[in-house]
């Protein structure tokens, strides 16, 4: 006799598996991340090479991308639950991945 798991259990297992995948496993869009950065982040962070001024007490995107231990996944997860000094941007997982991918571009020669 073959036992078939109910569809609801299969769906739950699939959802749990998907939740454990890295946020950036899907194809992120750095150009979308740049738009989000200019909208949400530029008040405090230097988010582009053409930006001349921001809050002096926060790291630039270049400094974040070049910091030891930087990873797209760590930044994406952080953006979903930011620290108290950051606004709650209510980003989707895809938006967080896009923004993390954009930040990562500062770790390479631009």
Segments predicted by a language model, with ranges:
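Bacterial N-terminal signal peptides that target proteins for export
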Residues: 2-13
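Electrostatic cytochrome c docking/interface patches
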Residues: 21-36
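Extracytoplasmic
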Residues: 39, 56, 70-73, 83, ...
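C-terminal capping alpha-helices of c-type cytochrome domains
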Residues: 90-110
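The canonical Cys-X-X-Cys-His
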Residues: 38-48, 99
């Amino acid at each position: 006799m073959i036992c078939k798991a109910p569809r609801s259990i299969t769906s739950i297992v699939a959802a749990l598996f998907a939740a454990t995948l890295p946020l950036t496993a899907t194809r992120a869009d750095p150009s979308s991340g740049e738009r989000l950065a200019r909208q949400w982040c530029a008040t405090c962070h230097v988010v582009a090479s053409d930006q001349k001024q921001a809050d002096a007490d926060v790291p630039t995107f270049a400094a974040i991308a070049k910091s030891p231990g930087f990873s797209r996944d760590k930044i994406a997860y952080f953006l979903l639950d930011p620290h108290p000094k950051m606004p709650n941007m209510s980003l989707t997982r895809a938006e967080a991945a896009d923004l993390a991918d954009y930040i990562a571009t500062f770790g390479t020669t631009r």
